[in-house]
Regions:
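Extended boundary segments
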Residues: 2-24, 70-98
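Cysteine-cluster motifs in flexible loop/terminal segments that predominantly coordinate metals
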Residues: 4, 39-55, 111-125
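Short, basic/aromatic beta-hairpin or loop at an interaction surface
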Residues: 27-41, 104-114
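Short, Lys/Arg- and Gly-enriched loop/turn segments at beta-strand edges
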Residues: 42-45, 68-77, 141-150
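Short, compositionally biased
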Residues: 50-52, 73-90, 147-161
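Long, low-complexity intrinsically disordered regions
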Residues: 102-160
């Protein structure tokens, strides 16, 4: 069950950039990546907090800014570069009755049992977890669900309480 609330004054919230580090070769504006656990080599690095700890495991981030500062790194042969990232908006599905642009919802994956469904990655998207509070940034189109569920493709932005 998705809980939904909406207010006319509620604008789509813009995510606040986070400063972190990424390999010099990967440091390209617009690049999206999934934050995964670090290597054992990272544990004693003095940059561990800014590089690893300020991002959440399993979330999808997008590089929105590049800074000129670079540092040596045991994992990246060309070192790491300071970048600005935001959590990426995630394409997903919601029941049609909840698909209202600007609405705030509590995300729950659809848990589709059809392993071969072409919409499975939308119904169970990477980067969102059950219980996440999200805002519907964009309502896209109705999904022709093979199991007959009344679903709509949307773009979700997780709401991070400051």
């Amino acid at each position: 069950m998705i809980k939904c609330s909406f207010s006319e004054e509620m604008a789509v919230r813009k995510p606040k950039p986070i400063i972190t580090l990424i390999g010099v070769r990967q440091a390209k504006k617009g690049l999206k990546f999934i934050h995964e656990p670090s290597s054992e080599k990272c544990k004693d690095c003095q940059l561990y907090r800014v590089c690893i700890e300020n991002l959440e495991r399993g979330r999808v981030y997008e590089i929105v800014g590049l800074r000129n500062k670079k540092f040596p790194c045991l994992l990246h042969d060309e070192g790491v570069r300071v970048v600005e990232v935001v959590e990426s908006d995630i394409a997903s599905t919601v029941p049609q009755k909840s698909a209202l642009e600007g609405a705030t919802i509590t995300f729950h994956a659809q848990n589709c049992e059809n392993q071969f469904c072409k919409f499975k990655s939308l119904c169970e998207p990477v980067g969102l977890f059950d219980g996440d509070k999200c805002q519907i940034v964009k309502v896209e189109n109705k999904i022709e669900c093979p199991l007959g569920y009344d679903l709509v493709k949307v773009l979700l932005r997780r709401i991070i309480d400051a």
